[in-house]
Amino acid sequence: MKMRVLWVGKTQEEWVRRGIDEYAGRIRRYTPLELAEAKEEKGAAAEAMREREGERLVKLLPRNARLILLDERGEQLSSPDLAGFIAANRDGGVQELAFAIGGAYGFSDSFRSMAYKTIALSRMTFTHQMVRIFLLEQIYRGFTIINGEPYHH
C-alpha cells in the first residue's frame, strides 16, 4: 500500500523541513510515501480560500486513494488505533492512503465530502507546519507498532 501526505502551503521553517525529511525517510523503510504540497490561497474570503485550496488538493489526490482528513473536529485515535487503521487498510487491499492537512481555514465542504475518515491529532490547535511533523511521526510510530518494533512504549 502506498501512502501520500498532502498539505497546503510551503514548509517555511528549516527545522520543520528537517523533521519532515527525517520521518518521511523512516516511513519509506516500510512503504512508498509521497509528499505533495498545494499552493496556499491568499487575499480572499475564508470560504473562497477553502474552495480554491480544496480544488488544488483534489488535483494531487489519486483516484484510487482513500482520503483521510486531519481536522480538530475529527475522531481522536490513539497511536495503536492509528496503527490498526493503517494495517486494516493495507490488509483490506486499499491501494493508497492519502492524509490531507488543510490550510489556515481548514477544508471546504466539497473536499470534506470526499473523505473516508476525519481524524484529529489533538483538541489543541497546532500550526499547520508542526502538524506535518506530528502526522509523519505518528505514521512512522504506527508502522513500528504493526511490526512489533520497540519504538512505541
Swiss-Prot record:
Disulfide bridge partners, by residue number: none
Q: Which residues cross the membrane?
A: none
Reaction equations catalysed:
pseudouridine(1915) in 23S rRNA + S-adenosyl-L-methionine = N(3)-methylpseudouridine(1915) in 23S rRNA + S-adenosyl-L-homocysteine + H(+)
* Keywords in alphabetical order: Cytoplasm, Methyltransferase, rRNA processing, S-adenosyl-L-methionine, Transferase
Q: Give the Gene3D superfamilies listed for this entry.
A: 3.40.1280.10
Q: InterPro entries per the record?
A: Alpha/beta_knot_MTases (IPR029028), RlmH-like (IPR003742), tRNA_m1G_MTases_N (IPR029026)
EC number(s) from the headed UniProt entry: 2.1.1.177
GO MF terms listed in the record are: rRNA (pseudouridine-N3-)-methyltransferase activity
Q: What does this protein do?
A: Specifically methylates the pseudouridine at position 1915 (m3Psi1915) in 23S rRNA.
Q: Report quaternary structure and partners.
A: Homodimer.
Similarity remark: Belongs to the RNA methyltransferase RlmH family.
**Which HAMAP family does its entry note?**
23SrRNA_methyltr_H (MF_00658)
Q: Can you name this protein? A: Ribosomal RNA large subunit methyltransferase H
